[in-house]
Amino acid sequence: MLKSQFQQKKMTRNYTGAWQKTPGRLLGIFLIRFYQITLSSLIGNQCRHAPTCSEYIYEAIARHGLWAGAWMGLFRIMRCGPFGTDGFDPVPPSLGHSCCFYKPWRYWKISDKHNK
């Protein structure tokens, strides 16, 4: 029998799809994982969304890079407050043509369009 038949996939709460391992993405992923392992375990799950904010930022950075992912994550955290949104809020698979690095406020609009 093949060894691969008996291997189980490692279960993780973070994005498991393929992503380019650039220095910026690796730095962002490292910081998010550091938060998840240290502070998040002490604080507990306080997020009102699924996936949680740290999982969302992890996936946003992995899919869209450090700059776009960090802005999307910041706007997600701003939406997660007591008077913000809740429920299922996934990372959009693509950003669209209106998003560019010198207009970071447009990353807020991506999440709004994706949720509707």
Curated annotation (Swiss-Prot):
It is a peripheral membrane protein. It is found in: Cell inner membrane. InterPro entries: Membr_insert_effic_factor_YidD. Keywords: Cell inner membrane, Cell membrane, Membrane. It comes from the Bacteria. GO terms for cellular component: plasma membrane. Belongs to the UPF0161 family. Could be involved in insertion of integral membrane proteins into the membrane. This is Putative membrane protein insertion efficiency factor. It comes from Bartonella tribocorum (strain CIP 105476 / IBS 506).
